[in-house]
UniProtKB/Swiss-Prot annotation:
Name of the featured protein: Uperin-6.2
Lineage of origin: Eukaryota, Metazoa, Chordata, Craniata, Vertebrata
Native organism: Uperoleia inundata (Floodplain toadlet)
Subcellular location: Secreted
A GO cellular-component term linked to this record: extracellular region
Keywords: Amphibian defense peptide, Secreted
């Protein structure tokens, strides 16, 4: 349903945010 879709999108956003933070720690420009 709608709630499932929203929660899945939020999970993906969280994951990409974590990846960006990790990349910053490693010194990547992104």
């Amino acid at each position: 349903g709608l709630a499932g879709a929203i929660s899945s999108v939020l999970d993906k956003l969280k994951q990409s945010q974590l990846i960006k933070n990790y990349a910053k720690k490693l010194g990547y420009p992104r």
